[in-house]
Each structure stands twice: as structure tokens, then as C-alpha cells.
């Protein structure tokens, strides 16, 4: 499902996606037609974003 569990987090998640794309060398990711990117490029952004979100949750759960 594409429905967000916390709709209020949408802006923060979009900002995180743009920051990660920049880190991965995909400048102007916001204005690029994602259909023109390879599945690998789009997958890197989503995969790295998921990794960062899991790390954040683990830190929060451990109290660090």
C-alpha cells in the first residue's frame, strides 16, 4: 500500500529522499523524470533511505 502510516511525515521523507539522492550524486532529483532513471538508480535512493530510517529507529529504540 502506498498510503502513509503518518501522513504528516511526508514532507520530511521527501526532503530526506532529496538529500540522499544528492549524496548518491543524483543532483536535481526533484525535477528529474524518475522514469528516465534506471531501476538501479531509483533503487539506490529507496534502499539507502530505508537503511537510514532503520538506523534512526534502532538508535531511538536503544535510547541513544
UniProtKB/Swiss-Prot annotation:
It comes from the Bacteria. The keyword rRNA-binding does not apply. Keywords: DNA-binding, Sporulation. Signal peptide: none annotated. One of its GO terms (molecular function) is double-stranded DNA binding. The record marks 19-20 as: Cleavage. Belongs to the alpha/beta-type SASP family. SASP are bound to spore DNA. They are double-stranded DNA-binding proteins that cause DNA to change to an a-like conformation. They protect the DNA backbone from chemical and enzymatic cleavage and are thus involved in dormant spore's high resistance to UV light. SASP are degraded in the first minutes of spore germination and provide amino acids for both new protein synthesis and metabolism. This is Small, acid-soluble spore protein beta. It comes from Paraclostridium bifermentans.
